[in-house]
Amino acid sequence: MAEDDVVFVGNKPVMNYVLAVVTQFNSGAKEVRIMARGRAISRAVDVAEVSRSRFLGDVVVKDIKISTETLNTDRGETNVSAIEIVLGK
């Protein structure tokens, strides 16, 4: 899987990320990874479900990985949850 086939979800509206996922599949990608951390995890799940159910009927959720990442902040180390959702045809 190429690094181009990854959509990092942040604070933008859900439909911006859905458009990115649909564009990746329409350009020939067989799999697209949706990645998010922290508060954006619920938005990433929304992106996967909207992409799969409304726009791409033949796409399925192939894998879901959850993890914890350690970030160094000015207040010391902080643990942040992360998710990776793999959609594929």
Curated annotation (Swiss-Prot):
Protein localization: Cytoplasm; Chromosome
SUPFAM superfamilies on file: AlbA-like (SSF82704)
BP GO terms, sorted: chromosome condensation
Principal cellular location given in the protein's record: cytoplasm
InterPro entries tied to this protein: Alba-like_dom_sf, DNA/RNA-bd_Alba, DNA/RNA-bd_Alba-like
Top-rank taxon: Archaea
GO cellular component, as recorded: chromosome; cytoplasm
Keywords in alphabetical order: Chromosome, Cytoplasm, DNA condensation, DNA-binding
One matching Pfam family: Alba
Molecular function GO terms recorded: double-stranded DNA binding; RNA binding
Family per similarity comment: Belongs to the histone-like Alba family.
Functional note: Binds double-stranded DNA tightly but without sequence specificity. Involved in DNA compaction.
Name of this chain's protein: DNA/RNA-binding protein Alba
Record lineage: Archaea, Methanobacteriati, Methanobacteriota, Stenosarchaea group, Methanomicrobia
